[in-house]
Amino acid sequence: MEVILKEDIETLGHRGDIVKVADGYGRNYLLPKKLAMEATAANKAVIEQMKASAVRRSAKEKAEAEQLVAQLDAVALVFERKVGDHDHLFGSVTSSDIAQQLEQQGFHIDRRKVQLEEPLKQTGEFLIPVKLHREVTAHVKVTVKGEETAA
């Protein structure tokens, strides 16, 4: 069965792609969940128009993302956290913390775009990727320091 994807599906392809899937998978999963539609001639024509506008929109978004990369690559974030033995943090620095501090500096970045595999639990300097567009990734320098304690 041929279907046209309405959403990006990691195992199949991107939105607007025409893919062959098993009949049961298409009929029982993709179509009822509105993740795809049948690949008829009329639907193919509509998708071609949508693809053309999506290409223009994607090119514009990519250009904006590339401008943002230059700005983000110059950003250095500093977090101070309480530290225990062996420079291990009490707590951690998460993608939400990074996105929040970027927001305070005037960048509107969703926390899900911060590609942090796991929260930072050590002191040091880290280069954290931020995925701005499907093809564009910026890197933000994050420094985690131990909090100064008054003795």
From Swiss-Prot:
Pfam families: Ribosomal_L9_C, Ribosomal_L9_N. Keywords: Ribonucleoprotein, Ribosomal protein, RNA-binding, rRNA-binding. It comes from the Bacteria. GO terms for cellular component: ribonucleoprotein complex; ribosome. GO terms for biological process: translation. Gene3D superfamilies: Ribosomal protein L9, C-terminal domain, Ribosomal protein L9, N-terminal domain. GO terms for molecular function: rRNA binding; structural constituent of ribosome. The keyword rRNA-binding applies. InterPro entries: Ribosomal_bL9, Ribosomal_bL9/RNase_H1_N, Ribosomal_bL9_bac/chp, Ribosomal_bL9_C, Ribosomal_bL9_C_sf, Ribosomal_bL9_N, Ribosomal_bL9_N_sf. Signal peptide: none annotated. Binds to the 23S rRNA. Belongs to the bacterial ribosomal protein bL9 family. PANTHER family: 50S RIBOSOMAL PROTEIN L9 (PTHR21368). This is Large ribosomal subunit protein bL9. The gene is rplI.
